[in-house]
Amino acid sequence: MAKQTLGSLLSSGFDLKGKRVLVRADFNVPLDPQGNITDDTRIRASLPTIQALAQAGAKVILTSHLGRPIQKDKATGAIQIAREGNSLAPVAVRLAQLLGQPVAFAPDCIGPEAEAVVSSLENGQVALLENVRFHPEEEANDPEFARKLASLADLFVNDAFGSAHRAHASTAGVTAYLQPAVAGYLVEKELQFLSGAIENPQRPLAAIIGGSKVSTKIGVIERLLEKVDKLLLGGGMIFTFYQAQGIPTGKSLVETDKLDLARSLMEKAKARGVELLLPVDVVVADRFDKDANAQTVSIHAIPEDWMGLDIGPESVKAFQAALQGCKTVVWNGPMGVFEFDRFAAGTEAIARTLADLTQAGAITIIGGGDSVAAVEKVGLADKMTHISTGGGASLELLEGKELPGIAALSEA
């Protein structure tokens, strides 16, 4: 079902002036030991929603998690909250700089301190509440905690796509008390690309799936086989497919309990007329190390004591040829161990190919996780049509699953 969005709410003439709007954002940003934000991408991604609400005269109340502050004592089971290094205070400072207006910071997300900050807001002003995960009730989706959080506001906007696959109090629980509950601009964009591009694609539609294990991508591959024209596989998972065909893989990573599954996926692709491409050559190493000895070999000539850590140059050429003329390309997962420069060439070549395709008019979608890091490493993030901000959420949406944080929103 289609969900209400902030865009549709504003265009319908809904008056937000003076309304207290609780916005669940994703400010889970990396901090250095001094508490400085090392990457503000997620904060920038939330700006359109915040600015639209402020311009409409709303009182904007932002909430988010940061890190995993809850630590359980293994021996006693006692819960401790690690506040050090997990406070959203640095985010309030950065947000104020980006918005060009003050951002009031509440030292808690519920209770008298939060209430005082919210009640001091004028129309168009912005406040940020402290980390919701400082309360164990957040991840337990506790109704009473959700009610307290919701009591600060009149309506709810979910703009935290990266947390949409979790049924937590601040992503799903609050919608029981706040209506309308709508998708912010970022969430709307993610749904448009990750769902829309696969349900109603411009064809040919190709998907590139990488990563080390087949087991983590089974759901995605199975769903994509029903939708795509071409499926290109890379990363460590390819060795399970080779071994399923009786090709020796040396010391490469193989999930021996997934050999039958790999065979059935290949058969499914054939039956559906999907062009399934596996690499024809690989870069192998004598050990898993950035300084390992490396050589490029055919997949039929992997030495017994070596392991494959990247796709080879012939595979890159074959993949590039297969992608030519594709109108939509979805990419999730690297082609090799791109953290080691020696085994990053395959991933970087695919990133450059997608950037070229985008320039030629194709829709390119980087579906979250490591492939985003890879594209950023090569400096091509701005050359793609859409870069997903989610990790697990992107994967689950590509699998066709309903995300709790989206399911809880008001119907359009």
UniProtKB/Swiss-Prot annotation:
Keywords: ATP-binding, Cytoplasm, Glycolysis, Kinase, Nucleotide-binding, Transferase
One GO cellular component, as annotated: cytosol
Family annotation (Gene3D superfamilies): Phosphoglycerate kinase, N-terminal domain (3.40.50.1260)
This protein's pathway: Carbohydrate degradation; glycolysis; pyruvate from D-glyceraldehyde 3-phosphate: step 2/5
Primary subcellular site in the record, as a coarse category: cytoplasm
UniProt KW Transferase keyword: yes
E.C. code: 2.7.2.3
Family statement: Belongs to the phosphoglycerate kinase family.
SUPFAM superfamilies: Phosphoglycerate kinase
Subunit structure: Monomer.
Intracellular or extracellular location(s): Cytoplasm
Gene Ontology molecular function: any one: ADP binding
Residues the entry annotates as binding ATP: 217, 308, 339, 368-371
Binding site for substrate: 26-28, 42, 65-68, 133, 166
InterPro entries xrefs: Phosphoglycerate_kinase (IPR001576), Phosphoglycerate_kinase_CS (IPR015911), Phosphoglycerate_kinase_N (IPR015824), Phosphoglycerate_kinase_sf (IPR036043)
Gene: pgk
GO biological process entries: gluconeogenesis; glycolytic process
Reactions accelerated catalytically: (2R)-3-phosphoglycerate + ATP = (2R)-3-phospho-glyceroyl phosphate + ADP
Leader sequence segment: none
Protein name in the entry: Phosphoglycerate kinase
